[in-house]
Amino acid sequence: METFLFTSESVNEGHPDKLCDQISDAVLDACLAQDPDSKVACETCSKTNMVMVFGEITTKANVDYEKIVRDTCRAIGFVSDDVGLDADNCKVLVNIEQQSPDIAQGVHGHFTKRPEEIGAGDQGHMFGYATDETPEYMPLSHVLATKLGARLTEVRKNGTCPWLRPDGKTQVTVEYYNENGAMVPVRVHTVLISTQHDETVTNDEIAADLKEHVIKPVIPEKYLDEKTIFHLNPSGRFVIGGPHGDAGLTGRKIIIDTYGGWGAHGGGAFSGKDPTKVDRSGAYIVRQAAKSIVANGLARRCLVQVSYAIGVPEPLSVFVDSYGTGQIPDKEILNIVKENFDFRPGMITINLDLKRGGNGRFLKTAGYGHFGRDDPDFTWEIVKPLKWEKPQS
Protein backbone atom coordinates (compact mmCIF):
# COMPACT_ATOMS: atom_id res chain seq x y z
CA MET A 1 0.00 0.00 0.00
CA GLU A 2 1.54 3.28 -1.13
CA THR A 3 1.03 6.08 1.38
CA PHE A 4 1.92 9.77 1.63
CA LEU A 5 2.23 12.38 4.37
CA PHE A 6 0.11 15.53 4.61
CA THR A 7 0.37 18.24 7.26
CA SER A 8 -2.09 20.84 8.60
CA GLU A 9 -1.49 23.49 11.25
CA SER A 10 -3.65 25.53 13.59
CA VAL A 11 -3.24 28.34 16.09
CA ASN A 12 -5.31 28.90 19.20
CA GLU A 13 -7.27 31.98 20.19
CA GLY A 14 -4.34 33.75 21.86
CA HIS A 15 -2.24 33.84 18.69
CA PRO A 16 -1.91 37.52 17.69
CA ASP A 17 -3.40 37.02 14.20
CA LYS A 18 -6.34 35.09 15.67
CA LEU A 19 -6.81 37.76 18.35
CA CYS A 20 -7.25 40.24 15.49
CA ASP A 21 -9.69 37.96 13.63
CA GLN A 22 -11.79 37.67 16.79
CA ILE A 23 -11.86 41.42 17.41
CA SER A 24 -12.91 42.06 13.79
CA ASP A 25 -15.73 39.52 14.08
CA ALA A 26 -16.78 40.83 17.51
CA VAL A 27 -17.22 44.24 15.83
CA LEU A 28 -19.26 42.60 13.04
CA ASP A 29 -21.47 40.86 15.62
CA ALA A 30 -22.08 44.13 17.47
CA CYS A 31 -23.07 45.94 14.26
CA LEU A 32 -25.36 43.18 12.95
CA ALA A 33 -27.03 42.71 16.36
CA GLN A 34 -28.40 46.27 16.21
CA ASP A 35 -28.56 46.77 12.43
CA PRO A 36 -28.73 43.58 10.30
CA ASP A 37 -28.09 45.67 7.16
CA SER A 38 -24.72 46.92 8.46
CA LYS A 39 -21.97 47.01 5.86
CA VAL A 40 -18.78 46.02 7.66
CA ALA A 41 -15.17 45.69 6.53
CA CYS A 42 -13.27 45.77 9.81
CA GLU A 43 -9.56 45.06 10.07
CA THR A 44 -7.53 44.79 13.28
CA CYS A 45 -3.82 44.93 13.96
CA SER A 46 -1.94 44.53 17.21
CA LYS A 47 1.56 44.86 18.63
CA THR A 48 3.00 45.37 22.11
CA ASN A 49 0.52 47.26 24.31
CA MET A 50 -1.57 48.36 21.29
CA VAL A 51 -4.64 47.28 19.32
CA MET A 52 -5.99 49.20 16.33
CA VAL A 53 -9.32 48.65 14.55
CA PHE A 54 -9.71 50.26 11.15
CA GLY A 55 -11.77 49.94 7.99
CA GLU A 56 -15.11 50.89 6.50
CA ILE A 57 -18.39 50.49 8.38
CA THR A 58 -21.81 51.88 7.46
CA THR A 59 -24.30 51.10 10.23
CA LYS A 60 -27.16 52.51 12.28
CA ALA A 61 -25.77 50.62 15.27
CA ASN A 62 -24.24 52.48 18.19
CA VAL A 63 -21.00 50.58 18.72
CA ASP A 64 -18.34 51.16 21.38
CA TYR A 65 -15.31 49.90 19.48
CA GLU A 66 -12.89 50.37 22.36
CA LYS A 67 -15.07 48.32 24.72
CA ILE A 68 -15.33 45.51 22.16
CA VAL A 69 -11.54 45.42 21.80
CA ARG A 70 -10.93 45.31 25.55
CA ASP A 71 -13.69 42.75 26.22
CA THR A 72 -12.43 40.42 23.48
CA CYS A 73 -8.81 40.60 24.67
CA ARG A 74 -9.90 39.98 28.26
CA ALA A 75 -12.07 36.97 27.35
CA ILE A 76 -9.12 35.34 25.58
CA GLY A 77 -6.94 35.79 28.66
CA PHE A 78 -4.84 38.85 27.82
CA VAL A 79 -5.08 40.40 31.28
CA SER A 80 -1.49 41.50 31.96
CA ASP A 81 1.68 42.54 30.16
CA ASP A 82 3.26 39.27 31.34
CA VAL A 83 1.00 37.20 29.08
CA GLY A 84 1.48 39.47 26.04
CA LEU A 85 -1.19 42.18 26.38
CA ASP A 86 -3.13 43.93 29.15
CA ALA A 87 -6.75 44.33 28.01
CA ASP A 88 -7.52 47.08 30.52
CA ASN A 89 -4.44 49.24 29.98
CA CYS A 90 -3.34 48.77 26.35
CA LYS A 91 -3.74 51.57 23.82
CA VAL A 92 -6.81 51.20 21.58
CA LEU A 93 -6.80 53.12 18.29
CA VAL A 94 -9.91 53.41 16.09
CA ASN A 95 -9.95 54.61 12.47
CA ILE A 96 -13.32 53.68 10.97
CA GLU A 97 -14.88 55.41 7.95
CA GLN A 98 -18.11 54.87 5.98
CA GLN A 99 -18.26 52.42 3.08
CA SER A 100 -17.20 54.03 -0.21
CA PRO A 101 -20.30 55.47 -1.97
CA ASP A 102 -18.95 54.05 -5.24
CA ILE A 103 -19.02 50.53 -3.80
CA ALA A 104 -22.39 51.12 -2.08
CA GLN A 105 -24.19 52.15 -5.29
CA GLY A 106 -22.71 49.29 -7.28
CA VAL A 107 -23.39 46.52 -4.76
CA HIS A 108 -26.64 47.31 -2.94
CA GLY A 109 -27.75 50.61 -4.54
CA HIS A 110 -27.45 52.41 -1.21
CA PHE A 111 -29.77 49.81 0.39
CA THR A 112 -32.43 50.07 -2.39
CA LYS A 113 -31.89 46.73 -4.18
CA ARG A 114 -34.02 43.65 -3.51
CA PRO A 115 -32.09 40.61 -2.14
CA GLU A 116 -31.97 38.86 -5.51
CA GLU A 117 -30.53 42.02 -7.11
CA ILE A 118 -27.70 42.60 -4.63
CA GLY A 119 -24.37 42.33 -6.40
CA ALA A 120 -21.17 40.77 -5.14
CA GLY A 121 -19.20 43.15 -2.92
CA ASP A 122 -16.05 42.42 -4.92
CA GLN A 123 -14.64 40.14 -7.56
CA GLY A 124 -13.03 36.89 -6.52
CA HIS A 125 -13.23 33.12 -6.46
CA MET A 126 -13.99 30.91 -3.47
CA PHE A 127 -13.65 27.18 -2.81
CA GLY A 128 -15.61 24.71 -0.71
CA TYR A 129 -14.23 21.27 0.16
CA ALA A 130 -15.54 18.12 1.82
CA THR A 131 -14.22 14.60 2.40
CA ASP A 132 -15.70 11.47 3.96
CA GLU A 133 -12.62 10.73 6.10
CA THR A 134 -14.15 12.21 9.30
CA PRO A 135 -17.71 12.60 10.69
CA GLU A 136 -17.30 16.38 10.18
CA TYR A 137 -16.63 15.83 6.46
CA MET A 138 -13.31 17.60 7.00
CA PRO A 139 -9.67 16.51 6.53
CA LEU A 140 -8.35 14.59 9.55
CA SER A 141 -5.03 16.49 9.62
CA HIS A 142 -6.94 19.77 9.92
CA VAL A 143 -9.49 18.44 12.43
CA LEU A 144 -6.79 17.15 14.79
CA ALA A 145 -4.62 20.28 14.58
CA THR A 146 -7.68 22.44 15.28
CA LYS A 147 -8.92 20.30 18.18
CA LEU A 148 -5.47 20.29 19.79
CA GLY A 149 -5.52 24.10 19.74
CA ALA A 150 -9.01 24.22 21.24
CA ARG A 151 -7.99 21.73 23.93
CA LEU A 152 -4.94 23.85 24.83
CA THR A 153 -7.28 26.75 25.53
CA GLU A 154 -9.68 24.52 27.48
CA VAL A 155 -7.03 23.19 29.89
CA ARG A 156 -5.63 26.70 30.33
CA LYS A 157 -8.98 28.22 31.21
CA ASN A 158 -10.22 25.37 33.45
CA GLY A 159 -7.00 25.28 35.46
CA THR A 160 -5.84 21.78 34.45
CA CYS A 161 -2.56 23.27 33.20
CA PRO A 162 -2.21 26.57 35.11
CA TRP A 163 1.22 27.25 33.59
CA LEU A 164 -0.29 27.79 30.12
CA ARG A 165 -0.53 31.25 28.56
CA PRO A 166 -2.88 32.29 25.71
CA ASP A 167 -0.62 32.00 22.64
CA GLY A 168 0.03 28.66 20.96
CA LYS A 169 0.33 26.71 17.72
CA THR A 170 -0.31 23.12 16.72
CA GLN A 171 0.54 21.00 13.69
CA VAL A 172 -0.34 17.43 12.74
CA THR A 173 1.13 15.24 10.00
CA VAL A 174 -1.09 12.35 8.93
CA GLU A 175 -0.10 9.35 6.83
CA TYR A 176 -2.74 8.79 4.15
CA TYR A 177 -3.68 6.18 1.60
CA ASN A 178 -5.25 7.31 -1.69
CA GLU A 179 -8.19 4.99 -2.39
CA ASN A 180 -9.15 5.85 -5.96
CA GLY A 181 -9.26 9.57 -5.18
CA ALA A 182 -10.69 9.30 -1.65
CA MET A 183 -8.44 10.02 1.32
CA VAL A 184 -8.04 7.26 3.93
CA PRO A 185 -6.05 8.18 7.08
CA VAL A 186 -3.69 5.41 8.19
CA ARG A 187 -1.93 6.89 11.23
CA VAL A 188 -0.67 10.11 12.81
CA HIS A 189 2.98 10.52 11.83
CA THR A 190 3.91 13.67 13.79
CA VAL A 191 2.34 15.90 16.44
CA LEU A 192 3.82 19.37 17.01
CA ILE A 193 2.70 21.73 19.78
CA SER A 194 4.35 25.05 20.63
CA THR A 195 2.57 26.74 23.49
CA GLN A 196 3.25 29.88 25.48
CA HIS A 197 3.95 29.16 29.15
CA ASP A 198 4.90 30.93 32.35
CA GLU A 199 8.32 30.95 34.05
CA THR A 200 7.44 28.29 36.64
CA VAL A 201 7.35 25.19 34.46
CA THR A 202 10.14 22.96 33.05
CA ASN A 203 10.27 21.56 29.52
CA ASP A 204 9.78 18.03 30.89
CA GLU A 205 6.65 19.11 32.76
CA ILE A 206 5.35 20.85 29.64
CA ALA A 207 5.84 17.70 27.53
CA ALA A 208 4.24 15.42 30.14
CA ASP A 209 1.20 17.67 30.60
CA LEU A 210 0.70 18.16 26.86
CA LYS A 211 0.76 14.39 26.25
CA GLU A 212 -1.59 13.59 29.13
CA HIS A 213 -4.06 16.48 29.04
CA VAL A 214 -4.01 17.68 25.42
CA ILE A 215 -2.91 14.95 23.00
CA LYS A 216 -4.50 11.90 24.69
CA PRO A 217 -8.04 13.35 24.89
CA VAL A 218 -7.93 14.64 21.29
CA ILE A 219 -6.17 12.10 19.06
CA PRO A 220 -7.88 8.69 18.86
CA GLU A 221 -5.60 5.89 20.07
CA LYS A 222 -5.95 4.00 16.79
CA TYR A 223 -3.95 6.71 15.00
CA LEU A 224 -1.01 6.71 17.45
CA ASP A 225 1.74 4.08 17.54
CA GLU A 226 5.30 3.67 18.77
CA LYS A 227 6.61 5.43 15.66
CA THR A 228 4.53 8.61 16.12
CA ILE A 229 6.87 11.59 16.56
CA PHE A 230 6.14 14.28 19.17
CA HIS A 231 7.68 17.75 19.03
CA LEU A 232 6.48 19.50 22.19
CA ASN A 233 7.79 23.06 22.53
CA PRO A 234 10.83 22.12 20.40
CA SER A 235 12.31 25.65 20.60
CA GLY A 236 12.72 25.14 24.36
CA ARG A 237 11.29 28.43 25.64
CA PHE A 238 8.08 30.32 24.79
CA VAL A 239 7.37 32.77 27.61
CA ILE A 240 6.94 35.94 25.53
CA GLY A 241 3.83 35.60 23.36
CA GLY A 242 0.68 37.24 22.07
CA PRO A 243 1.10 40.67 20.46
CA HIS A 244 4.25 41.21 22.55
CA GLY A 245 5.96 38.35 20.72
CA ASP A 246 4.60 38.94 17.22
CA ALA A 247 2.48 41.55 15.47
CA GLY A 248 -1.06 40.41 14.71
CA LEU A 249 -3.29 41.17 11.72
CA THR A 250 -6.79 40.15 10.61
CA GLY A 251 -6.94 37.69 7.72
CA ARG A 252 -3.53 36.04 7.99
CA LYS A 253 -4.78 32.57 8.96
CA ILE A 254 -7.01 31.77 6.00
CA ILE A 255 -5.85 28.15 5.60
CA ILE A 256 -6.40 27.46 9.30
CA ASP A 257 -9.88 29.01 8.89
CA THR A 258 -10.74 26.62 6.06
CA TYR A 259 -9.32 23.17 5.18
CA GLY A 260 -5.75 23.03 6.45
CA GLY A 261 -4.19 23.11 3.00
CA TRP A 262 -6.55 20.61 1.38
CA GLY A 263 -8.78 21.57 -1.55
CA ALA A 264 -7.96 25.08 -2.73
CA HIS A 265 -8.27 28.69 -1.57
CA GLY A 266 -9.17 31.86 -3.47
CA GLY A 267 -7.16 34.05 -1.08
CA GLY A 268 -9.96 36.03 0.57
CA ALA A 269 -10.21 36.23 4.36
CA PHE A 270 -13.47 35.97 6.34
CA SER A 271 -13.33 37.88 9.61
CA GLY A 272 -14.77 41.37 9.97
CA LYS A 273 -16.83 41.10 6.76
CA ASP A 274 -20.61 41.32 6.38
CA PRO A 275 -22.32 38.85 3.98
CA THR A 276 -22.23 41.16 0.93
CA LYS A 277 -18.52 40.31 0.94
CA VAL A 278 -18.43 37.14 -1.13
CA ASP A 279 -15.02 36.24 0.30
CA ARG A 280 -17.10 35.08 3.25
CA SER A 281 -20.63 34.30 2.03
CA GLY A 282 -19.40 32.68 -1.20
CA ALA A 283 -17.00 30.43 0.72
CA TYR A 284 -19.79 29.45 3.11
CA ILE A 285 -22.24 28.44 0.36
CA VAL A 286 -19.68 26.34 -1.54
CA ARG A 287 -18.77 24.54 1.71
CA GLN A 288 -22.45 23.69 2.11
CA ALA A 289 -22.57 22.49 -1.50
CA ALA A 290 -19.43 20.34 -1.20
CA LYS A 291 -20.51 18.88 2.16
CA SER A 292 -23.99 18.10 0.83
CA ILE A 293 -22.51 16.31 -2.20
CA VAL A 294 -20.40 14.04 0.02
CA ALA A 295 -23.04 13.55 2.74
CA ASN A 296 -25.61 12.55 0.10
CA GLY A 297 -23.26 9.91 -1.28
CA LEU A 298 -22.70 11.60 -4.66
CA ALA A 299 -18.93 11.54 -4.08
CA ARG A 300 -16.44 10.63 -1.35
CA ARG A 301 -14.50 13.84 -1.79
CA CYS A 302 -15.42 17.08 -3.50
CA LEU A 303 -14.21 20.58 -4.37
CA VAL A 304 -16.62 23.33 -5.48
CA GLN A 305 -15.53 26.72 -6.87
CA VAL A 306 -17.65 29.83 -7.42
CA SER A 307 -16.53 33.18 -8.87
CA TYR A 308 -17.98 36.69 -8.94
CA ALA A 309 -17.72 40.17 -10.49
CA ILE A 310 -18.26 43.25 -8.31
CA GLY A 311 -21.83 44.52 -8.51
CA VAL A 312 -23.10 41.46 -10.42
CA PRO A 313 -25.51 39.12 -8.57
CA GLU A 314 -25.12 35.95 -10.64
CA PRO A 315 -21.85 34.03 -10.28
CA LEU A 316 -19.54 34.05 -13.28
CA SER A 317 -18.75 30.35 -12.93
CA VAL A 318 -19.40 27.29 -10.79
CA PHE A 319 -17.04 24.30 -10.90
CA VAL A 320 -17.14 20.83 -9.33
CA ASP A 321 -14.31 18.29 -8.97
CA SER A 322 -15.03 14.95 -7.28
CA TYR A 323 -11.40 13.77 -7.65
CA GLY A 324 -12.68 10.69 -9.48
CA THR A 325 -14.82 9.60 -6.53
CA GLY A 326 -18.18 10.61 -8.01
CA GLN A 327 -21.02 8.09 -8.36
CA ILE A 328 -22.09 10.03 -11.44
CA PRO A 329 -20.04 12.29 -13.79
CA ASP A 330 -18.90 15.65 -12.39
CA LYS A 331 -20.96 17.41 -15.06
CA GLU A 332 -24.13 15.85 -13.62
CA ILE A 333 -23.07 16.69 -10.05
CA LEU A 334 -22.58 20.29 -11.20
CA ASN A 335 -26.13 20.38 -12.58
CA ILE A 336 -27.47 19.10 -9.23
CA VAL A 337 -25.48 21.81 -7.42
CA LYS A 338 -26.85 24.56 -9.67
CA GLU A 339 -30.42 23.30 -9.18
CA ASN A 340 -30.14 23.18 -5.37
CA PHE A 341 -27.96 26.16 -4.40
CA ASP A 342 -28.54 29.86 -5.09
CA PHE A 343 -25.15 31.54 -5.38
CA ARG A 344 -26.44 35.13 -5.57
CA PRO A 345 -25.03 37.02 -2.54
CA GLY A 346 -28.38 38.39 -1.39
CA MET A 347 -29.94 34.94 -1.52
CA ILE A 348 -26.99 33.28 0.25
CA THR A 349 -27.49 35.85 3.01
CA ILE A 350 -31.17 34.89 3.37
CA ASN A 351 -30.76 31.12 2.98
CA LEU A 352 -27.90 30.92 5.50
CA ASP A 353 -29.33 33.65 7.77
CA LEU A 354 -26.07 35.60 7.60
CA LYS A 355 -27.46 38.96 8.74
CA ARG A 356 -28.01 37.57 12.22
CA GLY A 357 -25.17 38.69 14.45
CA GLY A 358 -24.82 39.11 18.19
CA ASN A 359 -24.29 36.49 20.91
CA GLY A 360 -20.79 35.93 19.56
CA ARG A 361 -22.09 34.22 16.42
CA PHE A 362 -19.31 35.32 14.08
CA LEU A 363 -16.81 35.69 16.92
CA LYS A 364 -17.09 31.90 17.35
CA THR A 365 -16.04 31.34 13.74
CA ALA A 366 -12.84 33.34 14.27
CA GLY A 367 -11.30 30.73 16.58
CA TYR A 368 -10.88 27.04 15.66
CA GLY A 369 -12.21 27.09 12.12
CA HIS A 370 -15.27 28.16 10.14
CA PHE A 371 -16.11 24.65 8.92
CA GLY A 372 -16.81 21.23 10.40
CA ARG A 373 -18.37 22.70 13.55
CA ASP A 374 -21.44 21.17 15.20
CA ASP A 375 -23.22 24.40 16.13
CA PRO A 376 -26.64 25.66 14.95
CA ASP A 377 -25.14 29.12 14.29
CA PHE A 378 -22.97 27.53 11.56
CA THR A 379 -25.90 27.34 9.13
CA TRP A 380 -23.62 26.54 6.18
CA GLU A 381 -22.84 23.17 7.83
CA ILE A 382 -26.46 22.01 7.36
CA VAL A 383 -26.56 19.22 4.78
CA LYS A 384 -29.13 19.78 2.03
CA PRO A 385 -30.89 16.65 0.79
CA LEU A 386 -30.04 16.18 -2.90
CA LYS A 387 -32.12 13.99 -5.21
CA TRP A 388 -30.14 11.80 -7.58
CA GLU A 389 -30.32 8.31 -9.03
CA LYS A 390 -27.48 5.89 -8.50
CA PRO A 391 -26.47 4.36 -11.84
CA GLN A 392 -27.26 0.66 -12.28
CA SER A 393 -24.07 -1.39 -12.01
UniProtKB/Swiss-Prot annotation:
Matches recorded under Pfam families: S-AdoMet_synt_C (PF02773), S-AdoMet_synt_M (PF02772), S-AdoMet_synt_N (PF00438)
* InterPro entries on file: ADOMET_SYNTHASE_CS (IPR022631), S-AdoMet_synt_C (IPR022630), S-AdoMet_synt_central (IPR022629), S-AdoMet_synt_N (IPR022628), S-AdoMet_synthetase (IPR002133), S-AdoMet_synthetase_sfam (IPR022636)
- Subcellular locations according to the entry: Cytoplasm
Matches recorded under PROSITE patterns? ADOMET_SYNTHASE_1, ADOMET_SYNTHASE_2
One Gene Ontology cellular component annotation held by this UniProt entry: cytoplasm
Indicate what this protein is called per its UniProt record: S-adenosylmethionine synthase 1
Q: Which SUPFAM superfamilies match?
A: S-adenosylmethionine synthetase (SSF55973)
The EC number(s) given in the record are 2.5.1.6
Role according to the record = Catalyzes the formation of S-adenosylmethionine from methionine and ATP. The reaction comprises two steps that are both catalyzed by the same enzyme: formation of S-adenosylmethionine (AdoMet) and triphosphate, and subsequent hydrolysis of the triphosphate.
Residues that, per the record, bind L-methionine: E56, Q99, D246, K277
Q: Which GO terms describe its molecular function?
A: ATP binding; metal ion binding; methionine adenosyltransferase activity
Q: Which UniProt keywords apply?
A: ATP-binding, Cobalt, Cytoplasm, Magnesium, Metal-binding, Nucleotide-binding, One-carbon metabolism, Potassium, Transferase
Give cofactor(s), names only: Mn(2+); Mg(2+); Co(2+); K(+)
Instruction: Tell me the residue numbers annotated for binding K(+).
Output: E43
Q: Which organism is it from?
A: Elaeagnus umbellata (Autumn olive)
Coiled-coil residue windows: none
Reaction(s) catalysed by this chain, per the record, are: L-methionine + ATP + H2O = S-adenosyl-L-methionine + phosphate + diphosphate
* Entry note: cofactor: Binds 2 divalent ions per subunit. The metal ions interact primarily with the substrate. Can utilize magnesium, manganese or cobalt (in vitro). Binds 1 potassium ion per subunit. The potassium ion interacts primarily with the substrate.
Amino acids binding Mg(2+): E9
List this protein's GO terms for biological process: one-carbon metabolic process; S-adenosylmethionine biosynthetic process
